[in-house]
C-alpha cells in the first residue's frame, strides 16, 4: 500500500460567495547608499534578504514602506550628509508611515546617539547585523533600538547573494572578507567594520558559480584588505580557484594594502588571464615621514618595488591609487614628494582628498600634540589638492588619448545614459561608450571596439 496521503481538495465556492481577495502587493524598500563598493554590495544583500520577506525594491523613497540609509564614515561631513538626507525622508515617513533605518559605518560609529539626535529614525544597525535585518524590521514596529554589536569571527555569517537577483547583469560583487586589522592613523574602518574575518573559499567559489549560471561574466571580490585573505587558502589561491569557474570571464578585486601584496599575487597577474590588468593600490603619500605618521608600514621605495613588479608581471596593467593631502605635519617638501610619485608612477586614476580627522583614530587624538602633528591650514591643503588633481587629470588624459584608434575588448554592462549607446569596460577598467544597439551588444557580451574618442575620464568607440 502506498504511504502517500492524498491531498484534500478545497470545496468549490458556492454561487454568490465573494471572490477571494487578491494577494496583498509587496511592501517596498528604498536604499540610499553612501560610499564604497562594500556598501553597494551590502545594500544589495539587504534588498535580497528583505525580498524573501515580501519586500520589493522601490524606485524612489516616495513609494517606500521602509527607507534604509547605508552610510560611510571614511570622509569628513559623513554625518552631515546623512542628516541632510534624513531631513528629505522625514516627509515620506509622515505621509506613508514608512520606517526609517540607518546602517553602515556612521550607524556603527554613532549608535544610540543617532536615535537621540533624530527622533524619526526607527532603528540603527551596524554592518555585522545585516543578516538579522528582517527580524529587526518587525521589531521596529514596536520599539526604537540600535543593534551595533560585533559578532565573533566563528559566529559571523556572510550574507550570500541571491543569484537570481543578478540575472541579466554582466557584473557582480562577491564578498571575500570583511574588516581590517591594520591601524592606519587616519582610518576609521577598524572601528566601524571590525576585525578581519575571511569567508571560507568554498562559499566564495560557489557564489561565483551560481552567478555565472545566471549570466554574470565578471566578478569583483571585495573586502577592506583582500590581500590578507585567509579563508582556507591564500588570496592568490582564491583567485585561481575563481578563475576555474566555467562562465566567469573576468575577475577583479578591491581593496588592497601594499604591505600585504605578496609575490604569489604578482604571479597570478603574470599567469592568469582572467584576472584583469587593473590594480587599486593606495599609496596615500609620497613622503616617508608622512607614511610613518600614517602607520602605513611601508616606505616609498617599498611601494615602488611592488608597483614595478606588477608592471613587469603584467605589462600595460592600469594601477590606480589613493592620496591624502594635508595630513598633520605635511610640509611643502612632503607634498612635492607626492607629486613626484604621481609623475613617476603615472597612475591611471587617483582618489585624492584633503585629510579630515575621524573619531577614535590616532590622527584625531594626536592632532596638534607635537610639531610633527600640527594641522595643515585648510587653504594650504586645498591648494595642494588642486595641484595634485590637475596633474592626475593631465596624466589620465594622456593615457586615454593613447587608446585612440586601437581595437580593445569591451565587456558590455548595459545601456549608456545616451540614446543609441551601450556602456562597458575594457580589461583595464576604462569606461567605454559604444555606439551600438542591444542586439549588437547585449549585456555580458565581450565585443571588439575601435576607440574613436578619448574624453577626460572615458572612451567612446564603435564595433570593430
From Swiss-Prot:
Binding site for [4Fe-4S] cluster 2: 180, 184, 187
Annotated positions binding [4Fe-4S] cluster 1: 36, 72, 105
SMART domains reported in the protein's UniProt record: Elp3
Gene3D superfamilies in alphabetical order: Methylthiotransferase, N-terminal domain (3.40.50.12160), tm_1862 like domain (3.80.30.20)
Keyword check for Membrane: no
Cofactor, how bound (note): Binds 2 [4Fe-4S] clusters. One cluster is coordinated with 3 cysteines and an exchangeable S-adenosyl-L-methionine.
Annotated keywords: 4Fe-4S, Cytoplasm, Iron, Iron-sulfur, Metal-binding, S-adenosyl-L-methionine, Transferase, tRNA processing
Keyword Cell cycle assigned: no
Region (Disordered): 1-25
Domain TRAM as annotated: residue spans: 401-464
SUPFAM superfamilies hit by this protein: Radical SAM enzymes
UniProt GO MF annotations: 4 iron, 4 sulfur cluster binding; metal ion binding; N6-isopentenyladenosine methylthiotransferase activity
Record's GO cellular component terms: cytosol
EC number from the UniProt entry: 2.8.4.3
Domain (Radical SAM core) ranges: 166-398
Subcellular location(s) of the protein: Cytoplasm
Disulphide-bridged cysteine pairs: none
Catalytic activity: N(6)-dimethylallyladenosine(37) in tRNA + (sulfur carrier)-SH + AH2 + 2 S-adenosyl-L-methionine = 2-methylsulfanyl-N(6)-dimethylallyladenosine(37) in tRNA + (sulfur carrier)-H + 5'-deoxyadenosine + L-methionine + A + S-adenosyl-L-homocysteine + 2 H(+)
Cofactor field: [4Fe-4S] cluster
Function, as annotated: Catalyzes the methylthiolation of N6-(dimethylallyl)adenosine (i(6)A), leading to the formation of 2-methylthio-N6-(dimethylallyl)adenosine (ms(2)i(6)A) at position 37 in tRNAs that read codons beginning with uridine.
UniProt record similarity statement: Belongs to the methylthiotransferase family. MiaB subfamily.
Protein name: tRNA-2-methylthio-N(6)-dimethylallyladenosine synthase
Organism: Anaeromyxobacter dehalogenans (strain 2CP-C)
Lineage of origin: Bacteria, Pseudomonadati, Myxococcota, Myxococcia, Myxococcales
Gene that encodes the chain: miaB
Amino acid at each position: 500500500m502506498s504511504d502517500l496521503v492524498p491531498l484534500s481538495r478545497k470545496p468549490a465556492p458556492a454561487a454568490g460567495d465573494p471572490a477571494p481577495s487578491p494577494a496583498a502587493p509587496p511592501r517596498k524598500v528604498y536604499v540610499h547608499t553612501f560610499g564604497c563598493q562594500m556598501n553597494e554590495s551590502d545594500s544589495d544583500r539587504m534588498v535580497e534578504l528583505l525580498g524573501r520577506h515580501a519586500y520589493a525594491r522601490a524606485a524612489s523613497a516616495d513609494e517606500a514602506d521602509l527607507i534604509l540609509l547605508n552610510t560611510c564614515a571614511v570622509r569628513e561631513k559623513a554625518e552631515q550628509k546623512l542628516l541632510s538626507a534624513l531631513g528629505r525622508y522625514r516627509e515620506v515617513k509622515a505621509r506613508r508611515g514608512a520606517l526609517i533605518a540607518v546602517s553602515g559605518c556612521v550607524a556603527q560609529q554613532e549608535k544610540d546617539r543617532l536615535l537621540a539626535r533624530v527622533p524619526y529614525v526607527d532603528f540603527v544597525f551596524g554592518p555585522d547585523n545585516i543578516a538579522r535585518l528582517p527580524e529587526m524590521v518587525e521589531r521596529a514596529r514596536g520599539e526604537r533600538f540600535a543593534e551595533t554589536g560585533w559578532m565573533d569571527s566563528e559566529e559571523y555569517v556572510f550574507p550570500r547573494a541571491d543569484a537570481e537577483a543578478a540575472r541579466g547583469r554582466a557584473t557582480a560583487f562577491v564578498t571575500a572578507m570583511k574588516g581590517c586589522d591594520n591601524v592606519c592613523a587616519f582610518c576609521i574602518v577598524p572601528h566601524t567594520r571590525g576585525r578581519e574575518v575571511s569567508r571560507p573559499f568554498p562559499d566564495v567559489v560557489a557564489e561565483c558559480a551560481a552567478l555565472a549560471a545566471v549570466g554574470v561574466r565578471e566578478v569583483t571580490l571585495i573586502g577592506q584588505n583582500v590581500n590578507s585573505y585567509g579563508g582556507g587558502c591564500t588570496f592568490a589561491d582564491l583567485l585561481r580557484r575563481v578563475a576555474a569557474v566555467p562562465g566567469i570571464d573576468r575577475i577583479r578585486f578591491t581593496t588592497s594594502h601594499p604591505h600585504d601584496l605578496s609575490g604569489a599575487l604578482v604571479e597570478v597577474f603574470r599567469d592568469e588571464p582572467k584576472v584583469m590588468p587593473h590594480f587599486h593600490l593606495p599609496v596615500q603619500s609620497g613622503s616617508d615621514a608622512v607614511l610613518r605618521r600614517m602607520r602605513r608600514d611601508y616606505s616609498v621605495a617599498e611601494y615602488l618595488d611592488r608597483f614595478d613588479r606588477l608592471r613587469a608581471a603584467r605589462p600595460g596593467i592600469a594601477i590606480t591609487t589613493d592620496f591624502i593631502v594635508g595630513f598633520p605635519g605635511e610640509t611643502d617638501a612632503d607634498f612635492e614628494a607626492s607629486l613626484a610619485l604621481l609623475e613617476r608612477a603615472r597612475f591611471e586614476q587617483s582618489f585624492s582628498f584633503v585629510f579630515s580627522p575621524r573619531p577614535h583614530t590616532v590622527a584625531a587624538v594626536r592632532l596638534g600634540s607635537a610639531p610633527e602633528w600640527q594641522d595643515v591650514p585648510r587653504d594650504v591643503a586645498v591648494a595642494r589638492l588642486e595641484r595634485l588633481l590637475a596633474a592626475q587629470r593631465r596624466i589620465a588624459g594622456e593615457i586615454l588619448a593613447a587608446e585612440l584608434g586601437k581595437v580593445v575588448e569591451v565587456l558590455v554592462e548595459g545601456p549608456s545614459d545616451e540614446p543609441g549607446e551601450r556602456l562597458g569596460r575594457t580589461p583595464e577598467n576604462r569606461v567605454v561608450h559604444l555606439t551600438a544597439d542591444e542586439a549588437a551588444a547585449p549585456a555580458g557580451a565581450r565585443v571588439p571596439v575601435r576607440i574613436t574618442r578619448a574624453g577626460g575620464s572615458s572612451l567612446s568607440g564603435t564595433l570593430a
